[in-house]
A protein has these predicted regions:
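Intrinsically disordered, low-complexity Ser/Thr/Pro-enriched regulatory regions
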Residues: 303-304
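Charged, alpha-helix-forming regions
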Residues: 1-279, 286-292, 307, 311-339
Length: 339
C-alpha cells in the first residue's frame, strides 16, 4: 500500500549561513504597536537564534552585539524588544468545531543585562510555540537582502513574497487596503488615501524588492465602484539574468544602488505605456497631454486619474476639448487628494 505523502513542517527547514527561516504565520503580522525596520530585523535574528529549540519551553540567550548591527547604542535594542512584546499575530484556527481567531504575542518575557556587550535572555510564548510547531509554510529570508532593504515596508513585502513564492499553482494574493496597511505596519491615521499609500509605501517597497530579491513583484489596485478597496499582490521568479543583476546590486554600495533605482524609476515613469484596459473606456489622449500631466502633477498615477475622469465624465455631455477637460479634472483631483 502506498504511504501518504509526508507533510513537510516548517521546523524541518534549516537555516544556513546565508539564510534564515521565518514561519509563515509570523510574516502577515497585525501590529498593535507599529514595528520599525530595526524591530523586524531583530525579531528575525531572535527567531534564528532560538530555532533549534524554538518549540520547546526553554529560554534562549543571545549576545546584544549580534542585534545591534551598525548601531552603537543598546537603547534601540530595549525599545525594539518592548515593541515586539506588544505586537501580536492573528491566526485563523478551529475551536470546538467553530472558526476562530487566535491572538498571540510575538515575544515573551525577557531580561537584558545593562552592559553594552551583555546578553538578552528571552522566551517564545507557549501559544506561539504551538503555532510554530504546527506550521507548514515558511519564508526563507536571505540575510544579505534583509540587511540591504532600507524600509520596513520593503522588508515586509520581501517576507510576504518569500512566504508565497514557492506555493504551487499560485502566483497572486488579494488583500483589502486595511489588511495591507495592517501587515505593512502603517501607523493609524497615516497614508489613508490610496494615492498616498501607493506613493509613500508601496512603490518604494516594490522597487527595492524588485532590485534586490529573486522575484519580480507587482501590487495592482482593485476598485469597488469608484474607490480602490483591494490590491492584488503578484510575483514571479526571476530568470538567471535577473537573479545575476540582483546579486550584483547586493555587492554594490548602497549609494550607487539607490541612484540606479531612482534612475530606473524615472525612466519607467517617462516611458510607461497606457494600459490596455483603458482602451475600453475611450480613445487615448494626446501624448503631450499625458506628458503635461506628468510634469504638473508628479507622483500621481496618470492613468488611474484618467480612469477616474472617464468614469466622472460618462454621465455628462462630451467635452469639446477632451485633453483640456482631462487636465482641468486632474487639477481638481490633485487639490482634493493631495499626496
Amino acid at each position: 500500500m502506498t504511504k501518504p505523502p509526508r507533510t513537510y513542517r516548517t521546523l524541518d527547514a534549516r537555516p544556513s549561513g546565508d539564510s534564515l527561516i521565518k514561519p509563515g504565520e509570523l510574516v502577515d503580522v497585525v501590529e498593535v504597536t507599529p514595528l520599525t525596520l530595526a524591530d523586524r530585523r531583530i525579531y528575525n535574528l531572535l527567531l534564528e537564534n532560538a530555532w533549534d529549540a524554538i518549540d520547546k519551553p526553554v529560554t534562549h540567550v543571545i549576545a546584544k552585539t549580534l542585534l545591534r548591527g551598525s548601531h552603537n547604542s543598546n537603547d534601540r535594542i530595549g525599545a525594539s524588544v518592548e515593541r515586539l512584546m506588544s505586537a501580536i499575530v492573528k491566526v485563523e484556527v478551529v475551536w470546538d468545531g467553530e472558526p476562530a481567531i487566535e491572538r498571540v504575542q510575538l515575544l515573551g518575557g525577557n531580561i537584558e543585562t545593562l552592559r553594552s556587550d551583555g546578553l538578552l535572555e528571552y522566551e517564545i510564548p507557549s501559544r506561539l510555540r504551538k503555532i510554530i510547531r504546527n506550521s507548514t509554510v515558511f519564508a526563507r529570508l536571505q540575510r544579505e537582502v534583509m540587511f540591504a532593504l532600507t524600509s520596513k515596508y520593503a522588508l515586509t513585502l520581501y517576507e510576504m513574497v518569500q512566504k508565497r513564492g514557492n506555493l504551487r499553482w499560485r502566483a497572486s494574493d488579494r488583500f483589502t487596503l486595511e489588511e495591507l496597511r495592517g501587515i505593512l505596519g502603517v501607523p493609524k491615521g497615516k497614508l489613508t488615501s490610496w494615492s498616498n499609500l501607493k506613493l509613500r509605501a508601496i512603490e518604494p517597497a516594490v522597487a527595492e524588492v524588485n532590485q534586490l530579491s529573486d522575484y519580480v513583484v507587482e501590487i495592482a489596485p482593485i476598485k469597488t465602484g469608484r474607490r480602490v478597496t483591494h490590491v492584488e499582490l503578484r510575483w514571479w521568479k526571476k530568470d538567471g539574468e535577473g537573479q545575476g543583476a540582483a546579486e550584483r546590486e547586493l555587492a554594490s554600495s548602497r549609494v550607487g544602488r539607490e541612484q540606479r533605482r531612482k534612475e530606473a524609476e524615472a525612466e519607467a515613469d517617462g516611458l510607461k505605456p497606457r494600459p490596455a484596459w483603458l482602451d475600453a473606456k475611450g480613445a487615448s489622449l494626446q501624448t503631450t497631454t499625458y506628458e503635461t500631466a506628468r510634469l504638473r502633477f508628479p507622483g500621481y498615477d496618470i492613468y488611474f486619474v484618467e480612469a477616474e475622469w472617464r468614469a466622472w465624465a460618462a454621465t455628462r455631455e462630451a467635452p469639446r476639448d477632451a485633453d483640456a477637460a482631462f487636465l482641468a479634472f486632474f487639477r481638481t483631483y490633485a487639490e482634493r487628494h493631495p499626496l
